[in-house]
């Protein structure tokens, strides 16, 4: 049976892992076994946090909208309810951007929501 020489592949595999761990502190950037373990954890964290980022931004947008809405004298949930009743299809990202950058347009949307809430029948 022929002898299998794997030195090149093994060195490449180790080099790739050590390059991925190049910014880590201490042994995690120099020793292959520690670096491999840390790279695996890092990849898992980055996968998890790419999913979590979406919720984080949604929460940030809601906080910004709520702060701007309360400055206009209406709460966040009443604003969203009024915009839905008025048929205004603006997502939270756009609303938060308007609240920060264009207060006049945001105030107009708040007025639209108030009008829709005052016209809407109340359920009892």
UniProtKB/Swiss-Prot annotation:
Pfam families, per database record: Ribosomal_L20
SUPFAM superfamilies per the UniProt record, alphabetical: Ribosomal protein L20
Keyword Ribonucleoprotein: yes
Keyword field: Ribonucleoprotein, Ribosomal protein, RNA-binding, rRNA-binding
GO CC terms: ribonucleoprotein complex; ribosome
Highest taxon, organism lineage: Bacteria
GO molecular function: rRNA binding; structural constituent of ribosome
Any Gene Ontology biological process: translation
Similarity-based family: Belongs to the bacterial ribosomal protein bL20 family.
Function per UniProt: Binds directly to 23S ribosomal RNA and is necessary for the in vitro assembly process of the 50S ribosomal subunit. It is not involved in the protein synthesizing functions of that subunit.
Protein name: Large ribosomal subunit protein bL20
Lineage per the UniProt record: Bacteria, Bacillati, Actinomycetota, Actinomycetes, Acidothermales
Gene that produces this protein: rplT
């Amino acid at each position: 049976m022929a002898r299998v020489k794997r030195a090149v592949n093994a060195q490449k595999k180790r080099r790739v892992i050590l390059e991925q761990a190049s910014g880590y502190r201490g042994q995690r950037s120099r020793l292959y076994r520690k670096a491999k373990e840390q790279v695996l954890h890092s990849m898992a964290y980055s996968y998890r946090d790419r999913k979590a980022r979406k919720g984080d931004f949604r929460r940030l947008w809601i906080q910004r909208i709520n702060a701007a809405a309360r400055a206009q004298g209406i709460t966040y949930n009443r604003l969203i309810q009024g915009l839905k009743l008025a048929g205004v299809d603006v997502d939270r990202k756009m609303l938060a951007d308007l609240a920060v950058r264009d207060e006049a347009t945001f105030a107009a949307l708040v007025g639209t929501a108030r009008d829709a809430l005052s016209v809407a029948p109340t359920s009892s």
